[in-house]
Regions:
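Glycine/serine-rich anion-binding loops at beta->alpha junctions
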Residues: 153-162, 199-201, 280, 284, ...
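TM-adjacent membrane-interface loops and short helices in multi-pass inner/ER membrane proteins
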Residues: 258-299, 303, 312-314
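Transmembrane helix-loop junctions at the membrane interface of multipass transporters and ion channels
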Residues: 22-32, 86
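N-terminal membrane topogenic signal
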Residues: 1-17, 63
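Hydrophobic alpha-helical transmembrane segments of multi-pass inner membrane proteins, especially
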Residues: 35-265, 307-362, 389, 393, ...
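A juxtamembrane structural motif centered on a specific transmembrane helix
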Residues: 1-5, 22-26, 359-441
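Re-entrant/interfacial helical elements at transmembrane boundaries that shape
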Residues: 149, 208-209, 271, 287-293, ...
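Membrane-interface alpha-helices at helix entry/exit sites of multi-pass transporters
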Residues: 4-7, 159, 182-185, 269, ...
Length: 441
């Protein structure tokens, strides 16, 4: 069975590499003069994919290889589109990808010893709130939200990393407590984070945090009624923001009638829809569209660019890949006998799912657009690095499950006292991490 899985993963890896090869060869001929730099960039991208694959295979022998290949494909699509739009930005994105892999490796190390996360959750919570408070005074405004910090001329978005920290903090707290009344502190933390994001006018991130919290709350407690009450409270908050913030009312009005304000505020939505329509089912071809007519074509509206040049069918395929990543992440969570690992996997899966839904739904005019990025695809270092950290969480959870299953099979065959001590330094007698081995999530 293992050999069949390896063959399947090898085929997916080959398909990802073939896509990168074909796309960059096409880009090298898309200009009037042959672009040799496209082939060099192609070699770097393919090397990055192979290095990531080998690192995960070496460090996490029981990790989710298919998920890793799906993430690599999304990153490759992003790099192809960025190079087609602006080769300088594509190089920056490649550097961000390398940093993201390092961040993923850091998460792998932290998740190996989640007992450390228990001790760090309070300092991490204080730091998260402190950073968001600091943004109120030193934050730079971009796209209507005051959520950027500039250090040595480099802009980054702290809220992207607060999202990851929130998952780990909530998982650490909720893994010890399942009664609703004992979850007051993590709830206050989540509410504080969401409120600070609303004050910064980063409503997309606030919505994202709220949905992730509700997912983790339900996974921890199983209280559907209380979760629905929380969802209703979030809905009430969203309604209140409509009446409080002028830019929210304008955004909703533009979403409802983009053609009525085509020459002004509705231009972005209209251009995005026209780009998707002009691409048709199979696309205009890589390099043949007019993506620069769309505002924010490298970030918020990159999905419209993908559909214009690769087609609606390809766009649906991208959505299917997100869905498959989320399903595999949720299955990893459900299969774990460790509450912390399970909640981390649920939180990471929910974050990817909601973020992809919000941005793609906004581009296709299903919901009002909010300024968040398309996971693993949009241009931006903060988002890509944070998404790779989420990938690290999911890979660690899958590897943990595989190792625990291997230990159980060994114990069944040879007995529990026959020297299988691979996990003794990180797990208790029941195979779960020391502080969270009470039972299943």
């Amino acid at each position: 069975m293992g050999s069949f899985k390896r063959i399947g993963v090898a085929r997916v890896l080959a398909a990802v590499l073939l896509f990168a090869f074909a796309a960059f060869v096409l880009l090298s001929f898309s200009k009037e003069a042959f672009d040799a730099k496209a082939l060099l960039f192609m070699a770097l991208v393919m090397l990055l994919i192979l290095v990531q694959h080998m690192l995960l295979a070496w460090l996490l022998p029981h990790g989710d290889r298919l998920m890793a290949m799906l993430v690599s494909f999304l990153m490759t699509v992003g790099l192809v589109i960025q190079y087609r739009l602006n080769s300088s930005n594509a190089l920056n994105q490649l550097v961000f990808s390398c940093i993201g892999i390092v961040a993923m490796l850091i998460m792998l190390v932290l998740m190996k010893k989640p007992v450390v996360m228990l001790y760090l959750r309070i300092p991490a919570a204080i730091a998260s709130v402190g950073i968001l408070l600091a943004l109120l005074f030193i934050g730079k405004e971009y796209g209507g939200a005051v959520n950027w910090i500039s250090i040595a001329g480099i802009m980054f978005q702290p809220s992207e990393f607060v999202k990851v920290a929130m998952i780990l903090i909530l998982a650490g707290s909720m893994s010890e407590k399942t009664e609703v009344k004992k979850l007051i502190m993590p709830t206050l933390f989540a509410v504080t984070v969401a409120a600070l994001l609303v004050i910064q006018r980063d409503l997309g991130a606030a919505m994202l945090m709220a949905m992730v919290y509700l997912t983790m709350f339900y996974a921890s407690t199983g209280k559907l009624g209380t979760t629905l009450l929380g969802a209703a409270a979030c809905g009430a908050g969203a309604t209140a923001s409509y009446f409080i913030f002028d830019h929210v009312r304008r955004r909703v009005a533009v979403w409802q009638e983009p053609w009525a304000t085509y020459s002004t505020s509705g231009f972005q939505i209209a251009q995005g829809l026209m780009a998707i329509a002009s691409g048709g089912l199979w696309g205009m071809g890589l390099g043949e569209g007019s993506p620069k007519l769309i505002p924010a074509y490298q970030t918020d509206y990159i999905f419209a660019v993908i559909c214009e040049e690769f087609g609606i069918v390809f766009g649906i395929g991208i959505m299917a890949i997100y869905l498959l990543i989320v399903i595999r992440g949720c299955m990893t969570a459900l299969n774990s006998n460790n509450r912390f690992v399970s909640l981390c996997a649920f939180g990471a899966s929910a974050l990817i799912a909601v973020q992809a839904f919000i941005i793609i739904g906004g581009v296709i005019k299903l919901i009002p657009l909010t300024g968040i990025t398309m996971p693993y695809v949009s241009y931006g270092g903060s988002s890509l690095i944070a998404c790779m950290m989420l990938h690290g969480i999911l890979q660690s959870a899958a590897d943990y499950n595989g190792r625990m299953l291997e230990r159980e099979l060994y114990d069944e065959q040879y007995g529990a006292d026959n020297g299988y001590d691979e996990y003794d330094d990180e797990a208790g007698d029941d195979g779960a991490y020391e502080y969270s081995g009470e039972g299943e999530a």
